């Protein structure tokens, strides 16, 4: 199934081609542009048009790449152990799955929106390179490797607040100035 835009989203031929190439070639798509030009809406409409679940990861200045994988709550586990809680025996009870974990373990291919990736610190994109390339990561606490059942269609957005690292950009299929390409 090809993306051609929707009744709620008029896509240019170039942008539709970029979305379809990202899907076919299984490469992340980066859409850059000014706030309010429809970058996030693109991911929503792509998911709707392709009948795929949308998983949204909204990035803030304090977001760490590891949060997209998982977070281990050692403090709660320590407290539970002091209170004699039976849950403490299974460390998995203290793992909060991140958006990449959810996307990788979904039973069907999903659209993963990594929204405003340029808001995070400069190392954030590079910290995701291996996971996005291999489509797997290791959870040290449980000793398991989380592998993607289906490679998600990854759409990243950037407001051009700061430059993204060259090593990261070289792994992307396409970048676009959304202000020129998007019509909403």
Please describe what each predicted stretch is.
Residues 1-176:
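AAA+ P-loop NTPase catalytic core and its hallmark functional loops
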Residues 174-184:
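Single conserved hydrophobic/aromatic residue that forms the stacking wall/gate
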